[in-house]
Amino acid sequence: MAATTDTEHQEQAGTGGRGRRRPGRIAAQAVSVLGELLITAGLVMGLFVVYSLWWTNVVADRAADKQAEKVRDDWAQDRVGGSGQDGPGALDTKAGIGFLHVPAMSEGDILVEKGTSMKILNDGVAGYYTDPVKATLPTSDEKGNFSLAAHRDGHGARFHNIDKIEKGDPIVFETKDTWYVYKTYAVLPETSKYNVEVLGGIPKESGKKKAGHYITLTTCTPVYTSRYRYVVWGELVRTEKVDGDRTPPKELR
């Protein structure tokens, strides 16, 4: 048998070394894969945040503007046609019943529609409650609570600056024929999302003990969460008839 040479020993040793993976190399590869996964997850989360807090606002603003334009066009046609005031029921249209103006929130005019479902609020509007407590529309002239909700973040974020409202600040609701001017009298920065008593005809925790003409604004809190509810209450101080130029009340000038 021929003797094994030194060269053969070296080749065999080299071949055996290539067959084994060093623990350090495996760990490095695992860390690399994990890093790539984390970067991908971060990008996905970033895109989701952009979608939730920016793109949904764009879509909602477009929808709200379109619906608001329809409401104002309908009002203008009614006046030109000489139909005059059609009564409370006629205001409750699919497109919206009127516009909310809250100078402290700097949101301009906010279209108000019937209902507080996500389907309604996601269009960048405020909605009045029909469940679990039914809101009393100011156009009914009945005592009660005109309770409203809107998103705090995303989908138009109409009540994003609700925390800027202070006692004494005006809240104005505009219909085809009337301006309803309310004055903020109480704020509840945080309460359970299940606390429906704040929506009652005589809203609990607002300090009121007798029936009156109230308005309630509700939204999620803290910002970017839906854990609790932020509540603002106002009381009607006067009404003004809408003139031909739709001159706003002094609180909005």
Swiss-Prot record:
Ranges of biased composition (kind: Basic and acidic residues): 1-11
Active site: C220
Transmembrane spans: 30-50
Subcellular location per the Swiss-Prot or TrEMBL entry: Cell membrane
InterPro entries named among the record's database cross-references: Sortase, Sortase_Class_E, Sortase_dom-sf, Sortase_E
GO biological process: proteolysis
Inducers of expression: Transcribed independently of the operon's upstream, overlapping gene (SCO3851); transcribed with srtE1 over the first 72 hours of growth. Part of the strE1-srtE2 operon.
Pfam families noted in UniProt: Sortase (PF04203)
Region (Disordered): 1-23, 69-89
Domain of life: Bacteria
Catalysed reaction equations from the record: The enzyme catalyzes a cell wall sorting reaction in which a surface protein with a sorting signal containing a LPXTG motif is cleaved between the Thr and Gly residue. The resulting threonine carboxyl end of the protein is covalently attached to a pentaglycine cross-bridge of peptidoglycan
Enzyme Commission code: 3.4.22.70
Annotated family: Belongs to the bacterial sortase family. Class E subfamily.
Name of this chain's protein: Sortase SrtE2
Biological classification of the source: Bacteria, Bacillati, Actinomycetota, Actinomycetes, Kitasatosporales
Gene: srtE2
